[in-house]
């Protein structure tokens, strides 16, 4: 069964609904990627490079989940989002519930060295 092609604007609209970090920590280099930029990055990864759909995706420094949730929306087989900031991961979880993508992403609040396994695609 062929999966439907997601329009870039549809992806951008979804990503714009993700709640940003309320108080980013400069020492952790936290910033919110604009929805338009994130959609472009993910769209290229998904459709130009075939690196998202049916792939295992790791999002290092996932923050509030913008790239992780976008990858899940673009039909990644499995998505793991990792961030050392527990409050960011809590917000990523809330975002995934609100966008009905909770079952598509595993969230880990820890340093990246705890991640085990292999992944087809790494986002950061």
Predicted regions and their residues:
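Class I S-adenosyl-L-methionine-dependent methyltransferase catalytic core
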Residues: 1-124
């Amino acid at each position: 069964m062929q999966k439907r092609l997601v329009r870039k604007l549809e992806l951008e609209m979804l990503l714009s609904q993700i709640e940003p970090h309320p108080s980013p920590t400069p020492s952790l280099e936290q910033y919110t990627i604009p929805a338009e930029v994130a959609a472009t990055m993910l769209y290229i990864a998904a459709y130009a490079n075939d690196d998202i759909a049916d792939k295992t995706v790791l999002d290092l420094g996932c923050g509030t989940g913008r790239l992780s949730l976008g990858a899940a929306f673009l039909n990644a087989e499995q998505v793991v989002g990792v961030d050392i900031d527990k409050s960011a991961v809590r917000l990523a979880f809330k975002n995934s519930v609100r966008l009905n993508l909770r079952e598509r992403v595993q969230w880990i609040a820890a340093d990246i060295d705890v991640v085990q396994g292999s992944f087809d695609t790494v986002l950061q």
